[in-house]
C-alpha cells in the first residue's frame, strides 16, 4: 500500500507483541481510520488488540473501530498505529490467537462478548 503520509523517522521501542503464538496467524495490510484512535502522548494512536470493521476486499478504504449492530469486527489490529495525521497503514489479524495479558486494559475492554462472537472461529482470545 502507498504510504500516504510520506516517510518519517521516529525512534521507538519494540512493538507490543499481542500474539499468543506468533507462528500460527494470518494477517493482512489495511488502512486504519483516525476516528478509531485514542489520545496518547500528544498523538492519536489505535492500540494493538483493537477490534476493527472494514471490507477485506477493499483494504485501501480505512477500517474503523467495531461497534454493536452497525460495524461487526472482522479482525484485530496487530500493532499500535499512529493516526495523528489521518488514516495510516496497519496490520489486521484475521486468523490467530491473541494473548489478552499483552493487550492494555482499555483496549481489552473493547473485546466484548459480541466481538468474540463476531470473530469466533477466526481469532481466539487466551490468557497465559
Where do the protein language model's features map onto the residues?
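Surface-exposed, low-hydrophobicity beta-strand/loop segments enriched in small/polar/acidic residues
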Residues: 1-128
Amino acid at each position: 500500500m502507498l504510504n500516504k503520509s510520506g516517510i518519517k523517522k521516529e525512534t521507538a521501542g519494540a512493538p507490543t507483541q499481542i500474539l499468543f503464538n506468533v507462528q500460527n496467524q494470518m494477517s493482512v495490510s489495511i488502512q486504519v481510520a483516525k476516528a478509531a484512535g485514542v489520545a496518547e502522548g500528544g498523538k492519536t494512536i489505535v492500540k494493538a488488540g483493537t477490534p476493527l470493521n472494514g471490507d477485506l476486499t477493499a483494504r485501501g478504504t480505512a477500517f474503523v473501530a467495531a461497534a454493536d449492530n452497525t460495524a461487526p469486527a472482522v479482525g484485530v489490529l496487530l500493532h499500535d498505529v499512529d493516526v495523528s495525521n489521518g488514516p495510516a497503514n496497519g496490520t489486521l489479524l484475521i486468523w490467530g490467537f491473541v494473548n489478552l495479558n499483552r493487550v492494555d486494559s482499555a483496549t481489552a475492554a473493547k473485546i466484548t462478548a459480541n466481538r468474540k462472537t463476531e470473530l469466533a472461529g477466526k481469532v481466539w482470545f487466551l490468557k497465559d
